[in-house]
């Protein structure tokens, strides 16, 4: 049995930045450091940060006064920002800059009193944060998940000629394309972002899985079940006809996943660390894999700076 390892895989620039923000805050300010929501959706990463003194909460009322709070990579609503300001909490914002771009699109549309449609999954923290950027009382903001949801908007959209759409950054490109096509069919005048909202890392990892799935008998996606982009990778492989499994724990891997399989594809969601990928590879080798081959893929050079207050100066 042979393992083919997808490229690119694992951490993206936004996740790297978010984790660095928590690590540097712990180093510079000492524990406890509070983090609103899991900084990234990966159990392995979150447990490691907890052990170093990070305390993860779901809402700001769980953060004691006079403390530091970090907003997760998924972003927060304006109401959460205002609450932090009113309580004079020290805030470090780990929102991915690509999510912030979508937030700015929504805020801009809101100022123009345009109605906005967000393509995304209800309950996902990125969606909650993005919906929370809209403030216009004259317009409205609506969430759709699939093409079938679009027709229902006809009864509630006030002005189809003044309508804009944005997308959750971690959806599959295919998923959003179908919804966008339906939006344009039902609302021919709808406007969209100048550049697709799906982030570069999501796109690149999905492209890599498309190629990988053609050449293997089964795909293992390293990532947590609450990670949207990791789940999309699994679904994409399955859509292409290749059995796929999502795991963030080597002990969860079942020997029968590989019964009769010759080639095993392995990739990782944008919030999965390479350390965890290596643990998964070790487990698959224990189950009979004899070699690992890296598959060539698109090179990524994206880098996002941490806030200047957390930039640790080198001492000569």
Swiss-Prot record:
One of its GO terms (biological process) is terpenoid biosynthetic process. Its EC number is 1.17.7.4. It comes from the Bacteria. Pathway: Isoprenoid biosynthesis; dimethylallyl diphosphate biosynthesis; dimethylallyl diphosphate from (2E)-4-hydroxy-3-methylbutenyl diphosphate: step 1/1; Isoprenoid biosynthesis; isopentenyl diphosphate biosynthesis via DXP pathway; isopentenyl diphosphate from 1-deoxy-D-xylulose 5-phosphate: step 6/6. CDD domains: lytB_ispH. Isopentenyl diphosphate binds at residues 41, 74, 124, 227-229, 271. Binds 1 [4Fe-4S] cluster per subunit. The keyword Transferase does not apply. Signal peptide: none annotated. Keywords: 4Fe-4S, Iron, Iron-sulfur, Isoprene biosynthesis, Metal-binding, Oxidoreductase. (2E)-4-hydroxy-3-methylbut-2-enyl diphosphate binds at residues 41, 74, 124, 169, 227-229, 271. It catalyses: isopentenyl diphosphate + 2 oxidized [2Fe-2S]-[ferredoxin] + H2O = (2E)-4-hydroxy-3-methylbut-2-enyl diphosphate + 2 reduced [2Fe-2S]-[ferredoxin] + 2 H(+); dimethylallyl diphosphate + 2 oxidized [2Fe-2S]-[ferredoxin] + H2O = (2E)-4-hydroxy-3-methylbut-2-enyl diphosphate + 2 reduced [2Fe-2S]-[ferredoxin] + 2 H(+). Dimethylallyl diphosphate binds at residues 41, 74, 124, 227-229, 271. [4Fe-4S] cluster binds at residues 12, 96, 199. One of its GO terms (molecular function) is metal ion binding. Its cofactor is [4Fe-4S] cluster. The keyword Iron-sulfur applies. The active site is at residue 126. Pfam families: LYTB. Belongs to the IspH family. Catalyzes the conversion of 1-hydroxy-2-methyl-2-(E)-butenyl 4-diphosphate (HMBPP) into a mixture of isopentenyl diphosphate (IPP) and dimethylallyl diphosphate (DMAPP). Acts in the terminal step of the DOXP/MEP pathway for isoprenoid precursor biosynthesis. This is 4-hydroxy-3-methylbut-2-enyl diphosphate reductase. The lineage of its organism: Bacteria, Pseudomonadati, Pseudomonadota, Gammaproteobacteria, Vibrionales. The gene is ispH.
């Amino acid at each position: 049995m042979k393992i083919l390892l997808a490229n690119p895989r694992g951490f993206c620039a936004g996740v790297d930045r978010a984790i660095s923000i928590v690590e540097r805050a712990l180093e510079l300010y000492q524990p406890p450091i509070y983090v609103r929501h899991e900084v990234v959706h990966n159990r392995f990463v979150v447990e490691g940060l907890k052990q170093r003194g990070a305390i993860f909460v779901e809402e700001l009322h769980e953060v004691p006064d006079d403390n530091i709070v970090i907003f997760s990579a998924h972003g927060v609503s304006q109401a959460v920002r205002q609450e932090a300001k009113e309580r004079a909490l020290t805030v470090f914002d780990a929102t991915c800059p690509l999510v912030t771009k979508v937030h700015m699109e929504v805020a801009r549309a809101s100022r123009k009193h345009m109605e906005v449609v967000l393509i995304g999954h209800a309950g996902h923290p990125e969606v909650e944060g993005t919906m929370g950027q809209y403030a216009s009382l004259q317009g409205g903001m609506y969430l759709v998940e699939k093409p079938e949801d679009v027709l229902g908007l006809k009864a509630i959209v006030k002005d189809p000629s003044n309508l804009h759409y944005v997308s959750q950054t971690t959806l599959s490109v295919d998923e959003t394309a179908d919804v966008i096509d339906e939006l344009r069919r039902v609302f021919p005048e709808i406007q969209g972002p100048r550049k697709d909202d799906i982030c570069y890392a999501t796109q690149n990892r999905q492209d890599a899985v498309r190629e990988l799935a053609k050449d293997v008998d089964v795909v293992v996606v390293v990532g947590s079940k609450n990670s949207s982009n990791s789940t999309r990778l699994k679904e994409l492989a399955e859509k292409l006809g290749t059995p796929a499994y999502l795991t963030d724990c080597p002990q969860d891997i079942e020997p029968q996943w590989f019964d009769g399989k010759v080639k095993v594809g392995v990739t990782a969601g944008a919030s999965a660390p390479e350390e965890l990928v290596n643990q998964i590879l070790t487990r698959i080798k224990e189950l009979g894999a004899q070699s690992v081959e890296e598959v060539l893929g698109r090179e990524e050079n994206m880098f996002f700076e941490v806030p200047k207050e957390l930039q640790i100066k080198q001492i000569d």
